[in-house]
Amino acid sequence: MSFFIASSPHAHSRRSTPDLMKWVALCAIPGLAAQTYYFGWGTLIQLIFAIAVAVSLEALVMICRKRSPMRALRDNSAIVTAWLLAVAIPPWSPWWIIVIGLIFAIVIAKHLYGGIGQNLFNPAMVAYVVLLISFPVQMTSWSAPTLLIPDHVNFADTLSLIFTGFDYDGLSLQQVRAGVDGVTMATPLDAFKTGIHTGATPSEVLSQPIFGGLAGIGWQWVNIAYLIGGLVMIKKRIIQWYIPAGFLASLTLFSLIFSVITPGETASPIFHLLSGATMLGAFFIATDPVSASTTVKGRLIFGALIGALVFIIRSWGGFPDGVAFAVLLANMCVPLIDYYTKPRTYGH
């Protein structure tokens, strides 16, 4: 009997990079749907515009590098980067926010390091941090959930607000936001931190209208939706469970310990798990195969480090949510983590 001898690498999976990226996008749809339902059409508009900008930038960079743009576009990595950035920014952010962010994500954080598979840091999180530091007002001005708004801002007005700064009645973005919020409102994490710093107790802070049964209204269901999508990715073996498990276990442990030590200053573990970008970060951002750790032990440590950093930044940092900063700081530690968690070679 003759056997066919194939050359290496002897891959055990037939999934290609485009297939993996498609699955990531498909599994993010529940989270996108929840964000659109609770925060209006802005997130969906930002996503469509972001994909168009990301694809254009990817093609332009590949042409400048004298490489085939179609081959690069077929891997769908630019679409996933655009997706992660679009769902991370406030829905009513002006159009130029997404353009500047994607320039940093695609051109600098990705192609400056050599393109797909070569970047040291998560491109979407590099873009998010640059935007957050450079434009803090635009990046922290979230509107209230639609359930708290008497008159929802429709699709046409949302489109006009994003691209012109005014709705069809001539009201500016600031006027519209003041009309639906009463005050400029950030995320529940920001509201909780501000309330604690002003001397309120956690129960007093959580009695505000923006908070629901478990966490912030809308945000708890957005996180649950991303959790469902993440579990599907694990089931389909698109990602492995090590990084999300390390992330969520670490965040839960730290919030549980400090809620016992300082009960008047720390939110409960369930609040941390269902607030901000926790589930998006655990399943869709931290699991980036290029910038994350590569060993089994390393992935657990990598995820646990992110969870600890998220809790530290949320509790004592200058920003309400710390997922982006935590991921980038953990990316810096990947070479060290991989070096000390290398599996022993058989026979040595």
UniProtKB/Swiss-Prot annotation:
Q: Which cofactor does it need?
A: FMN
Kindly list the biological process annotations in GO that this record carries.
Answer: electron transport chain; transmembrane transport
Record's keyword annotation contains Zinc: no
- Please give the InterPro entries that the UniProt record associates with this protein: NqrB/RnfD, RnfD_bac
Subcellular location as annotated:
Cell inner membrane
As recorded in UniProt, its EC number(s) are 7.-.-.-
Which family, according to the similarity comment? Belongs to the NqrB/RnfD family.
Q: Which PANTHER family match?
A: ELECTRON TRANSPORT COMPLEX PROTEIN RNFD, ION-TRANSLOCATING OXIDOREDUCTASE COMPLEX SUBUNIT D
Q: What does this protein do?
A: Part of a membrane-bound complex that couples electron transfer with translocation of ions across the membrane.
Q: What is this protein called?
A: Ion-translocating oxidoreductase complex subunit D
Q: Which organism is it from?
A: Vibrio parahaemolyticus serotype O3:K6 (strain RIMD 2210633)
Name of the encoding gene: rnfD
